[in-house]
Amino acid sequence: MSLSKKLTLDKLDVKGKRVIMRVDFNVPMKRNQVTNNQRIKASLPSIRYCLDNGARSVVLMSHLGRPDGVAMPDKYSLEPVAAELKSLLGKDVLFLKDCVGSEAEQACANPPAGSVILLENLRFHVEEEGKGQDPSGNKLKAEPDKVEAFRASLSKLGDVYVNDAFGTAHRAHSSMVGVNLPQKASGFLMKKELDYFAKALENPERPFLAILGGAKVADKIQLIKNMLDKVNEMIIGGGMAFTFLKVLNNMEIGASLFDKEGATIVKEIMAKAEKNRVNITFPVDFVIADKFEENAKVGQATVASGIPAGWVALDCGPETNKKYAQVVARAKLIVWNGPLGVFEWDAFANGTKALMDEIVKATSKGCITIIGGGDTATCCAKWNTEDKVSHVSTGGGASLELLEGKVLPGVEALSNL
């Protein structure tokens, strides 16, 4: 799957056309008010581009939360998003009470020029995801002919299709792969994601460094293996490191994370690294706690000293930070996925913060720095570094699957150039 050879919105002729656009308006709400409008703001350049270039209408579709294929307008309606979008765009937004069916089709058939229309939550229909469950917890499965009808109805709402929801690109949902129109383009958010991941996966600058944190080795096996075919250096940190250090150095790890399943392939991973001449750096010292709590008693440990029984490592220590800084300084391209410690608690945030500072420094010297979504993106928000790195991905699961070497259905479905 090529990331760089897909039709993009700037190459799509939208003049006089109805644009149906998949966006990610899955935003936090409290009492029917949007509490963080970041994702809505992020979609504005694509929406405005269509309007400025003479689109007849822009029909927006999104999911919100997990209604699991059941209509729950009291809890998961996108109606409050329409109000927020109206104030951000400075123009009226027509909200429709459903995303498919005759009323939606009629409203979108012949709209006044320059209309912006927001459809109700796609996931109120089990046909969007293909499966779900009812309020009593019984599993629901969509019938194939109904999925087809759902997709056909969505396809009637526009003349051209734009996908700007990278965060859902790893899901083969109806709105991602089932809108059957001749031209399907990526919006500007999606394009930025694909451009940056193409830089990493299709033609990387070197030395190329991957920094992998997070907890379980088993969850990251595919990621580590795929990246070992691409990078020159790798840092393995976070909770994942203890499984490696126990197997490779016979380190005493106390009550720190040990992943039995992951342990069985540590040697295979190291052999692959050696074969590919990839230099892997592990932590050498740690900040430890007598229990997994924010206000725990704090201590220090090294790989050599081991971690005392009952204690748990929750961050890497100052010597590790120095080692990592040297590795980062050598790189021309960095992909970072997963924090190095329990960064949510200040006592255990120093390792992740120190690394973030080094990555910001590297970026200012011309290194390309890509932050995978999820927790690592949260770190950027926490320390206000979103504008100080090259790219912060909006898709946790989607970016992880790309880095694992998987094909993303939502990208695959776009028109090829």
UniProtKB/Swiss-Prot annotation:
Molecular function terms, GO-annotated: ADP binding; ATP binding; metal ion binding; phosphoglycerate kinase activity
Binding site for AMP: A215, K216, K220, G239, A313, E344
Location of N-acetylserine modifications: S2
Binding-site residues, ADP: G214, G238, F343
A Pfam family the protein falls into: PGK
Tissue-by-tissue expression: Testis specific.
Sites bearing Phosphotyrosine, chain numbering: Y196
Chain sites annotated for binding Mg(2+): A215, A218, D219, D375
Entry's localization field: Cytoplasm
N6-acetyllysine: residues carrying this PTM: K11, K75, K86, K97, K131, K146, K199, K267, K291
Pathways per UniProt: Carbohydrate degradation; glycolysis; pyruvate from D-glyceraldehyde 3-phosphate: step 2/5
Chain positions recorded as ATP binding sites: A215, K220, G239, A313, E344, D375, T376
Residues at which (2R)-3-phosphoglycerate binds: V23, D24, F25, N26, Q38, R39, S62, H63, G65, R66, L122, R123, H170, R171
GO CC, alphabetical: cytosol; sperm fibrous sheath
Modification sites for Phosphoserine: S2, S4
Keyword tags: Acetylation, ATP-binding, Cytoplasm, Glycolysis, Kinase, Magnesium, Metal-binding, Nucleotide-binding, Phosphoprotein, Transferase
Documented EC number(s): 2.7.2.3
Family classification: Belongs to the phosphoglycerate kinase family.
Function: Essential for sperm motility and male fertility but is not required for the completion of spermatogenesis.
Protein's recorded name: Phosphoglycerate kinase 2
